[in-house]
Amino acid sequence: KNMGRETFIAPMVWENGWPVVCPGTGKLDWAYPAPNLPEAPVEEIPETDDFDEKELAFCWNCLGTPAEGDFRLEDSCLKIRTTARPMEPTSPEVMGKIRSGMLPNVNCAGFVGRRQQHMSYTAVARMRFEPEESQTAGLILLQNNYHSLKAEMTCEKGKRILRVVKGYLTQEAEVTYHNVDMPYQKEICGEREWNSDTVILELKAEGQKNTFTAVEEDGTRHVLASELDGGFLGSETAGGFVGAYVG
C-alpha cells in the first residue's frame, strides 16, 4: 500500500436502503462497462521534466510551505537549498502547540517530489552537488520523515561518498506506528566513493523490490544496492494514508 489511499470509480446499487458497491463480487475489478458519456480528455502528467519552464509543474510538491529561495528554476535546472529536518516523529503535545501557534513549525525540508503512481517504475535524476561535511542530497523514496529509502551523496573526511540508506522506526507491520518512543534507525545498504560532483541516480522499483544505481556521465553503471524491500513504507507499518513520494 505504498501508494496510499487510492480513489476508484465502481458500480453501486441500493439494496434495502443500503448502498452496495461492486454487487455480486464485493471487490474491484480491473474494468467495468462505461456509460455513454462524451469524452473528457485530461492532460497527462509528463514522464520527464527538464525544468526549463518558468514555474514548477503542478505534479511537484514540497514538504511544508517553501520560503522564497528554498528552490528555483535556473539554467534548465532545479536548484534546491539543502535544509536539515529532524528524522523523528512529532509528539502529539508538540504538534498541538504548533497548530495553536505556540511553537513555530519546522522549516520546509529541502525536498521537491512527486507522488508514486505505479507499483513498478523507474525514476532517474541527474544531480550536481558539492557537499560539505555531513551535508547530503540525492534521490529518495519517502513515506514520511522517518520511513524512507534514499541514495545520497555526502562528504566524509574530505571524500565524496555515495550511499543508500534505509530509515525507519519499525519494519514490522504489527508494531503500532503511534508509539512515538521508538528510536529512529538507519541502515547503510551500500556505499562507494565517487570522484565527481555529478551523478545520475536511478531507482528501479519492481513491486516492493527497489534497486539503486549510480551512473557516470559516460554511462558506466554502478549498482549501489539491489532489491531492497520497500514493504515497510506502506501504511500498515509507517502510518498515514497518502502514499509515498519520489523526489
Labelled PLM ranges:
Residues 10, 17-247:
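Extracellular glycan-recognition regions
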